[in-house]
Each structure stands twice: as structure tokens, then as C-alpha cells.
Swiss-Prot record:
Modified residues (N6-succinyllysine): K151
Quaternary structure and partners: Homotetramer.
Cofactor binding: number and manner: Binds 3 Mg(2+) ions per subunit.
Residues annotated for Mg(2+) 3 binding in this entry: D119, D122, E281
EC number: 3.1.3.11
Cofactors, names only: Mg(2+)
Name this protein carries in UniProt: Fructose-1,6-bisphosphatase 1
Native source organism of the sequence: Ovis aries (Sheep)
Function: Catalyzes the hydrolysis of fructose 1,6-bisphosphate to fructose 6-phosphate in the presence of divalent cations, acting as a rate-limiting enzyme in gluconeogenesis. Plays a role in regulating glucose sensing and insulin secretion of pancreatic beta-cells. Appears to modulate glycerol gluconeogenesis in liver. Important regulator of appetite and adiposity; increased expression of the protein in liver after nutrient excess increases circulating satiety hormones and reduces appetite-stimulating neuropeptides and thus seems to provide a feedback mechanism to limit weight gain.
Residue numbers of Phosphoserine PTMs: S208
A biological-process GO annotation: regulation of gluconeogenesis
Residues that bind AMP: V18, M19, E20, E21, G22, T28, G29, E30, M31, T32, K113, Y114, K141
Length: 337
């Protein structure tokens, strides 16, 4: 006989974890309220994603969002869920969503001190073929003394107090980065709670996978072409890198975090400013990767150092294991001469 119980009676839920962190920092508890509310939305989206075919949520809603992407029915549902739960958390004052042209200003009676930027359903072009998709979020403190406005969201990623993503894959995982590091929580559907499964996650110093859409290779700049060539045909005859690209940022970045390597969505001739959005895609992912010991750059500067000028601003991004990103930057510097 073993003394080990078949059921862990001392589980660490995301609520318990954030409350413990808040107690150490002598916080007000507003962050716990906010993340609890966000988890409620993530659970609801996870359920909707898994029921989408039965509930007729596949297909296009007949509109495009502010960045020109076709809006899917699940996008609309997910956006409404996140907006409503964040407003009712009494912890937010400004919300920025990929799906809304302007920032959402929370009603005075529901306002708190946080600004949240989010992509409610990233990778939604993959919904119909059942590829993993996700929700991305970044949380800032309001720093101005004025009434809440769109300007409160135009902060560099260095000001983030928390960021992360939910991945709706073979299981639903929440990856949360805060000042002390990155922690992963798995949704246990039996009890409806996110359970801590990986504490203080660190990315490998060097990986063996590169990830980008090589369909755009004719528009790559010389540095990127040279880097990819080196990964396929290493000059020192070492093993070539594997190529993995899902086309869903959450899935690609999560794999990079877990296995190491490099993820690239660079600028090219067709998209000189890149295609991914700074506030609710690049900054949160860069924050997660940096807190895990990795690097995130545009090729010219650290993603987290950029001061946004527009809530839907686009930037190039290269992130991942520090040695892999450094190698790319060295090639970039060398080819620019």
C-alpha cells in the first residue's frame, strides 16, 4: 500500500498563486480580481471553442476588424466575453482589443486602476481546421492622473505588470508572466480550475527549431535569408534546425518557450512594419519570453522598449532562445554593412 493519495489535496490554483504574490507585494487585491475575471472568460472561450462545430460558431460573421482581418463568429463571442468580464471585475479603466477600433473606456462606477490590452482569439483564421488558437493579454497600471483615455494604453512593454496567454490546444493552458517570472497553469475540467503545473519556467539558452512562414521568402531581407540558410545548411556541418510553423502565434510561441529555438514574424518588402500588433500580440509575448530568460527584438530594438503611437501599431518580431536571437542580430548587423 502507498500513502500517496490519488487526489492532490493541496493544489495551487491561479487564484491562490496570485493572492500569494499579491500578499508578498502588499497589494490591494485588484490584480487578483482582474485575473480571476480573465480566467472566467478563458474558461468560457475554451468551452465555446470545443463546442464550435455543434453550436454553429464556425464561419465568418460577415465583417472585417480594424486591421483588415475577416471576423469569425467565435471572434465576436470571445471579444464580448473578455470585454464584459473585465468591465465587471471593477479592476480596469481602459480596454484595448484587436476587434475594436477605439479603446473601450470603462464606466466610472466600475473603474479600477488597470489597463488591459488583449487579442480575444488569436489565430482565428485556423478555427475551421481545428488548429490550436489562443487568447493574449497584457496588463498595465494607469499612470496618468487624468480621466481614462486611449493614451493610457500607449505605454512601452517595459511598463507591463503582468502578461500572458491562454492556449486552446489538446488541453487549455494559461501561461502567466509577472514580475517574478513565468508560471504555467492547466485547466482541470473536472473542477473548473487552473492548476499550477510548471513553476518559474525558463527557456533553453539555444534551441534546434526555427519558426517562420517561408512562403514569403522572396520578400525576405538579406539577413533573414542568410539566417534561414544557415539553419538549413550549418557552415560547421552540425545538425540542421527543424522547421515548425503553425500560423497561430500562441501555438508557435508556446512551442518556442517549451522547446527553445526562434520564432520570427519579420518585416519584409510587402509589410515593412511587420504584421503583428504591438500592444496585444508582440508586447505580451515579448514580456513572457524575456521573463523566461529569452530575447525579443524587432531586429533593430527590443520589442519592450518601443513606445507605441497607435493602439493598433504593427511591428516585426523575432523572439526565442537568447543564443538563437543573438545569432540573428549578429547576421543582421553584418549584412547591414
Amino acid at each position: 500500500m502507498t500513502d500517496e493519495a490519488p487526489f492532490d489535496t493541496n493544489i495551487v490554483t491561479v487564484t491562490r498563486f496570485v493572492m500569494e504574490e499579491g500578499r508578498k507585494a502588499r497589494g490591494t487585491g485588484e490584480m487578483t480580481q482582474l485575473l480571476n475575471s480573465l480566467c472566467t472568460a478563458v474558461k468560457a472561450i475554451s468551452t465555446a471553442v470545443r463546442k464550435a462545430g455543434i453550436a454553429h460558431l464556425y464561419g465568418i460573421a460577415g465583417t472585417t476588424n480594424v486591421t483588415g482581418d475577416q471576423v469569425k463568429k467565435l471572434d465576436v463571442l470571445s471579444n464580448d466575453l473578455v470585454v464584459n468580464v473585465l468591465k465587471s471585475s471593477f479592476a480596469t479603466c481602459v480596454l484595448v482589443s484587436e476587434e475594436d477600433k477605439h479603446a473601450i473606456i470603462v464606466e466610472p462606477e466600475k473603474r479600477g486602476k488597470y489597463v488591459v490590452c488583449f487579442d480575444p482569439l488569436d489565430g482565428s483564421s485556423n478555427i475551421d481546421c481545428l488548429v490550436s488558437i489562443g487568447t493574449i493579454f497584457g496588463i498595465y497600471k494607469k499612470i496618468s492622473k487624468d480621466d481614462p483615455s486611449e493614451k493610457d494604453a500607449l505605454q512601452p512593454g517595459r511598463n507591463l505588470v503582468a502578461a500572458g496567454y491562454a492556449l486552446y490546444g489538446s488541453a487549455t493552458m494559461l501561461v502567466l508572466a509577472m514580475v517574478n517570472g513565468v508560471n504555467c497553469f492547466m485547466l482541470d475540467p473536472a473542477i473548473g480550475e487552473f492548476i499550477l503545473v510548471d513553476r518559474d519556467v525558463k527557456i533553453k539558452k539555444k534551441g534546434s527549431i526555427y519558426s517562420l512562414n517561408e512562403g514569403y521568402a522572396k520578400d525576405f531581407d538579406p539577413a533573414l535569408t542568410e539566417y534561414v540558410q544557415r539553419k538549413k545548411f550549418p557552415p560547421d556541418n552540425s545538425a540542421p534546425y527543424g522547421s515548425r510553423y503553425v500560423g497561430s502565434m500562441v501555438a508557435d510561441v508556446h512551442r518556442t518557450l517549451v522547446y527553445g529555438g526562434i520564432f520570427m514574424y519579420p518585416a519584409d518588402k510587402k509589410s515593412p512594419s511587420g504584421k503583428l500588433r504591438l500592444l496585444y500580440e508582440c508586447d505580451p509575448m515579448a514580456y513572457v519570453i524575456e521573463k523566461a530568460g529569452g530575447m525579443a527584438t524587432t531586429g533593430k530594438e527590443a520589442v519592450l522598449d518601443i513606445v507605441p503611437t497607435d493602439i493598433h501599431q504593427k511591428v516585426p518580431i523575432i523572439l526565442g532562445s537568447p543564443e538563437d536571437v543573438t545569432e540573428f542580430l549578429e547576421i543582421k548587423k553584418y549584412t547591414a554593412k
